[in-house]
């Protein structure tokens, strides 16, 4: 019983404790709810108050924006009204101006109609008077025909014939007088111009020279230039086409060749070889090639310097090169570049005296002998060849005609043509200017070389020993050793049948085979 009582007591205690705890828990939640409601009420009140403030601010901002937009709109309306007023004013002014112009036009039209009516009236009166005059004229003609016994046509023909005869007589007399006066005046003026031009020219005399002297420091250098068994000197002659003469002349070697360009290349190449000290066939070929390039550059520089000195502009580069090559050419012993410069200056002086184009005259004078400097031999006269070059490189028609006509091969169509012809004669015909011997000698050597070039397989040909020997270098692929002898015979036979020459001409055919490999 006691145990049951205890158990009941325990259960009752547990139940009572649980009830007390539940009561206490319920009482705390109630307080929390009350506090939450208070806080929510306070927050809601604050939110309503803040919302009212925001609402008032927004309403105030909206009112300010409305006032601003209203002001802008009113300003736009005012601006538009002002522009409309200005346009209306311009329209009214334009209408007033147009109205005035219409009034003027109406007045002018009325005046024109009045003048037209007046003109028509005068025209009618004039036509009436013209009819009356024609009637009177016919009446007078009829009376004259009756008196003279001639018809109108017969009288007119007699009068015309008489006037023609008288006019022809007077015209012939006047023409004859004018011709005589022109001849006298032209001769006097031409003499005056030519004398004035000649007096302003002074140049050197012609010099005939086919050799150059290469000075050396000692005779020991001669042996190095000759080389073992003469291989060096043969290599120089083969590379340059110049005959090297080594004789007893102390400290000097003679270079003989009719072509000044070849002589100059040989002289410069020898100078480089002796200065460098390395003289052997391979080095000789290398130096000659470089020297040839150097001479080509120098030719271009000489051409540019010449045209600048003469004040000639716009010349084609190829023509400038031809002008530079004139330095190494001569005509009858007269240096071609000096002659052309002289003719150019003379043409400029004479053109200035005659009131012609000085620049064109100097241009034609400088280029008149470019046909004497051909890249290859041509059958054309040098004047026509020069004219072809000038046309090819864009020179003016007057200049081309002056070049082609200065030896009368073509008709002179330009005023520059006779000027160039006269100035060429002044430069070449004065005492000491030219000598015939050198030019004919050089032409004979050129012809000798051209004979060799006419055969197949010939690479180059050089006339040496004053034309007594012709060295022909052939291509080993085209000419065999057996054919070399036959080629030499054929060339000698052609020279014998086609050319006139003193003494004998030795023909030497040189054939060389080279095998070159490179070790890498």
From Swiss-Prot:
Main localization, broad class: membrane
Residue ranges of every copy of the HD domain listed in the record: 336-429
Subcellular location: Cell membrane
SMART domains in the cross-refs: HDc, KH
InterPro entries for the chain: HD/PDEase_dom, HD_domain, HDIG_dom, KH_dom, KH_dom_type_1, KH_dom_type_1_sf, Ribonuclease_Y, RNase_Y_N
Entry's transmembrane regions: 1-21
GO biological process, one term: mRNA catabolic process
Enzyme class label: hydrolase
Membrane topology note: Single-pass membrane protein
Keyword hit for Membrane: yes
GO cellular component: plasma membrane
Residue span(s) of domain KH: 210-276
Cited Pfam families: HD, KH_1, RNase_Y_N
GO MF term list: RNA binding; RNA endonuclease activity
UniProt keyword NAD, yes or no: no
Keywords, in A-Z order: Cell membrane, Endonuclease, Hydrolase, Membrane, Nuclease, RNA-binding, Transmembrane, Transmembrane helix
E.C. numbers: 3.1.-.-
Organism superkingdom: Bacteria
Protein function: Endoribonuclease that initiates mRNA decay.
Protein family (similarity comment): Belongs to the RNase Y family.
HAMAP family reported for this sequence: RNase_Y
Protein name: Ribonuclease Y
Species of the source: Flavobacterium psychrophilum (strain ATCC 49511 / DSM 21280 / CIP 103535 / JIP02/86)
């Amino acid at each position: 019983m006691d145990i049951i009582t205890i158990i009941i007591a325990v259960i009752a205690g547990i139940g009572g404790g649980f009830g007390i705890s539940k009561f206490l828990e319920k009482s705390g939640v109630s307080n929390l709810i009350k506090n939450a409601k208070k806080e929510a009420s306070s927050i809601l009140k604050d939110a309503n108050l803040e919302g009212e403030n925001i609402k008032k601010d927004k309403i105030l901002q909206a009112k300010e924006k409305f006032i601003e937009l209203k002001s802008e709109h009113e300003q736009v309306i005012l601006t538009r009204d002002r522009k409309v007023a200005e346009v209306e004013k311009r329209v009214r002014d334009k209408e007033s101006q147009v109205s005035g112009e219409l009034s003027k036009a109406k007045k002018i039209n009325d005046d024109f109609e009045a003048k037209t009516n007046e003109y028509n009236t005068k025209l009618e009166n004039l036509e009436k008077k013209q009819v009356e005059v024609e009637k009177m004229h016919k009446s007078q003609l009829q009376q004259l025909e009756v008196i003279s016994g001639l018809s109108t046509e017969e009288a007119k023909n007699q009068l015309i014939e008489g006037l023609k005869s008288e006019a022809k007589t007077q015209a012939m007399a006047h023409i004859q007088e004018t011709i005589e006066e022109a001849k006298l005046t032209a001769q006097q003026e031409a003499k005056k111009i030519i004398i004035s031009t000649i007096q302003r020219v002074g140049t050197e005399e012609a010099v005939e020279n086919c050799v150059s002297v290469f000075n050396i420091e000692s005779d020991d250098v001669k042996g190095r230039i000759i080389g073992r068994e003469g291989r060096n000197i043969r290599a120089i002659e083969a590379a340059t086409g110049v005959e090297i003469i080594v004789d007893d002349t102390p400290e000097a070697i003679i270079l003989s060749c009719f072509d000044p360009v070849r002589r100059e290349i040989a002289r410069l190449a020898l100078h480089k070889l002796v200065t460098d000290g390395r003289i052997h066939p391979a080095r000789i070929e290398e130096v000659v090639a470089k020297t040839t390039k150097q001479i080509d550059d120098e030719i271009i520089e000489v051409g540019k310097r010449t045209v600048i000195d003469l004040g000639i502009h716009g010349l084609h580069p190829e023509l400038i090169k031809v002008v530079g090559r004139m330095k190494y050419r001569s005509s009858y012993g007269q240096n071609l570049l000096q002659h052309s410069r002289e003719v150019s200056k003379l043409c400029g002086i004479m053109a200035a005296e005659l009131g012609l184009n000085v620049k064109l005259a100097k241009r034609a004078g400088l280029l008149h002998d470019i046909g004497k400097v051909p890249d290859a031999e041509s059958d054309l006269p040098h004047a026509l060849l020069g004219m072809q070059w000038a046309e090819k490189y864009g020179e003016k028609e007057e200049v081309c005609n002056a070049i082609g006509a200065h030896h009368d091969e073509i008709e002179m169509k330009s005023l520059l043509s006779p000027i160039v012809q006269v100035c060429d004669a002044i430069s070449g015909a004065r005492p000491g200017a030219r000598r015939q011997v050198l030019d004919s000698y050089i032409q004979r050597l050129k012809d000798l070389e051209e004979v060799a070039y006419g055969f197949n397989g010939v690479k180059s040909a050089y006339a040496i020993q004053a034309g007594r020997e012709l060295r022909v270098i052939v291509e080993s692929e085209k000419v065999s050793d057996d054919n070399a002898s036959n080629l030499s015979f054929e060339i000698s036979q052609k020279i014998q049948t086609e050319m006139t020459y003193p003494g004998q001409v030795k023909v030497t055919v040189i054939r060389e085979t080279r095998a070159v490999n490179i070790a890498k």
